Amino acid sequence: KEEAKVLGTVIGIDLGTQYL
């Protein structure tokens, strides 16, 4: 999801990878 990518970039790549 694009949202996850944005959140991951803002909060941390860790979250982005988890949601990806």
From Swiss-Prot:
Induction: By tunicamycin. It is found in: Endoplasmic reticulum lumen. It comes from the Eukaryota. One of its GO terms (cellular component) is endoplasmic reticulum lumen. The keyword Repeat does not apply. One of its GO terms (molecular function) is ATP binding. Keywords: ATP-binding, Endoplasmic reticulum, Nucleotide-binding. Probably plays a role in facilitating the assembly of multimeric protein complexes inside the ER. Belongs to the heat shock protein 70 family. This is Luminal-binding protein. The lineage of its organism: Eukaryota, Viridiplantae, Streptophyta, Embryophyta, Tracheophyta.
